[in-house]
Amino acid sequence: MASSTNRRPAIAGVAQIVQRAEDPREAASPLRLMERAIQLAAEDAGAPKLVESLDAIFVPRGLWQYGDPGRLLAERLGSPNARTTVGAISGHIVQILVNRACAEITAGRADVIAIVGGESENSKRRLQREGIPLHWDDQIPGEPDHRIGDVTFMRTPDEQDAGILNATSVFSMCDVSLRRSLGLTPSAHRDRISDLAHRMSQIAAQNPYAWIQREVSAEEIRNPTPHNRMVNYPYTKLMTSNISVDQSAALILCSAEAATRFGVPEAKRVYLRASTEMSKTILLSERDVLHRHPGQDLAAERVFELSDTNVGDLDHIDLYSCFPFAVQAGAAALGLGTDPVPSLTGGMTFFGGPFGNYVLHSKATLVERLRADPGSIGAIGSVGGSFAHFSYGLYSTDPGEYEAPRIEDVSDEFAAMPRRSYAAGYAGLATVEAYSVVVMREGPYQAVFAALTEDGERVWGRSHDPDLMAALLADEEACGRTAHLREGIIELR
């Protein structure tokens, strides 16, 4: 029987691809990008033959229509017997795939596993705009051997009626709640998050794999223009994740025995030291405060306990960055600020947000940093759903004292925590705690409000009053104001 040391999983190879096709008709499909990323990851490991010995291929779900992309990749790469897994659509799922891969390797059920994702969304959209039929013939239906993750966007009828319809609406509301807790004026907070985004663009400008490779000023990010419209106040387009990219990334994980057998140098190997995941969720209405999630705090606290480290031990950090709030909340959960900005890639606006695959890019970037800084520790923080699911991973070239990575799912512990009550169909007075304005291409559409009753129950309301929306977009304060609700419509007093 193999020793536990021989079963120690390590990331052996990584790769990233950015495709900038001058003619979208010549662009490679997502599948071809993923195939090439796995090949490059094997080459990075110094072991090209790894692609012919894959025991499993894990793929986070993308915008593409492949039923079982892992099977198509396995056949192309010469590993036809590889087991296939598709992960759910969620920003935190990549870390969960890494955790499952490590568990498979540690248990002896696999020696070599590839985790890969990719999108050609920019090329696809260019073809659609030009009226050119999509030329990819590889989007074949199928069913993977396994699926991981059951992530749903839960909302109450009151939340839905108020306009809580997607991640943008949730994160913008949470950012306003955070701003209020910090005692900042609306204008000062917009300056703050614009500067955060600006500093992320500086990182992306130096990243060869970034989609937008230029420094963007805070003023350009902050101020709405025809090319940078307001999406959900306080967010302009340059504060939101950019999914219109052509990018792919891959990791190859091996057991210690397999890495040695295939000739992967020790200096290439990077180890998962500890990880936490939190996949259960509660309604937005049930959160005590909108800008803090106890499940995220729990996951962050526990990953330090599992790894016998603290925030001061972290040398390299990348936090999920779909919106400015995600970065701020992730930093707060770890006990960090946002200066220096906790990003290795440049963030999901400027580096790019290839749907569920961004975290593979952040991990590939981290692996390269850790190899260049042996013995250092790096952290990746991920957010899924609408600030609902979380995962953390701590990595190093030093595997630490434990024979296997320490992984814990804190979902059940979180689910047992107390929740705020909410009042469905409420009519009466309440105090505004957060708000946003939904802005369509044609102009302001709807103001959305979260408020608390005198009894502390959360309620939701909306307004289509053009004067009110204009005032909010001009940075007028609404938090703390008394409001009257009736049949979901809110009037500020």
Name what the model sees in each region.
Residues 95-103:
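Conserved phosphate-binding catalytic cores of ATP/NTP-utilizing and phosphoryl-transfer enzymes
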Residues 1-87, 102-110, 114-245, 249-251, ...:
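Conserved "HGTGT" condensation-loop signature of ketosynthase/thiolase-family condensing enzymes
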Residues 378-380:
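Active-site capping/gating regions of soluble enzymes
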Residues 385-386:
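C-terminal substrate-binding/catalytic lobe of Rossmann-fold NAD(P)-dependent dehydrogenases
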Residues 351, 355-359, 370-371, 375:
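A conserved active-site cap/scaffold subdomain adjacent to cofactor or substrate pockets
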